[in-house]
């Protein structure tokens, strides 16, 4: 499919169910067989930290194909002083419109809107090989940690103007709504959508069978049961395993692509 003409606009109440349905489609490939992001979107709109001025949809071919939703979050420094920042997510794009720049368009548009609204920075949890393409850096570079004091490649920050995070260090907190989802609620909410077969994750064996003995041992040492688990880890993280040379990493990228994932920093296009 050729890249579509995309129109960006604010989400309207009459869009809500369609956006939840596209979010369900975008995130259905979950190791547990179903996703909860559509219920999260439903609940996010009802919390005080939701920012309707940054709740944008992307339209193409006469329908909604993408959505980005923002909430206010905070950084708490060691002295207890808090600094307001943004977080976004889910960022959803219909599968058939992924890798066409829809997600990137939504991000760049809303980054500028957020800057004009006076927000200083955006802090997210996301794929560490994708989001640096639009300016995100590891949060640890800014002296930020998660609420429990950890840091990792998938925890990233983007200052919205020069010096926006200067002198600000500490722990990052998001709204409790992100932790409010349990399987019972998700499956009950899911009844309001068309029936959908549970997703079956891809066993790691499909990759192991393509690798030589040394690389196979290295991947086994990562402790992954499913290939899907690589989608949450950076190329830098995976390639650091002893025994995975560039030839092996090329095989990893190829196998990921064969199963529908554009994974790794060398991929030319993503969402």
What annotation goes with each model-predicted range?
Residues 116-120, 125-150:
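Conserved active-site alpha-helix within GNAT-family acetyltransferase domains
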Residues 88, 93, 99-112, 123-124:
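Conserved acetyl-CoA-binding loop-helix of GNAT-fold acetyltransferases
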Residues 200-271:
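Compact, charge-rich alpha-helical regulatory domains located at protein termini
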Residues 73-88, 98:
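A conserved beta-turn-beta hairpin within the catalytic core of GNAT-like acetyltransferases
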Residues 1-14, 21:
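Conserved N-terminal entry element of GNAT/NAT acetyltransferase domains
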Residues 20, 27-75:
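Active-site rim helix/loop that mediates acceptor-substrate recognition in acyltransferases
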Residues 162-199:
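Acidic/histidine-enriched, glycine/proline-rich intrinsically disordered or flexible terminal extensions
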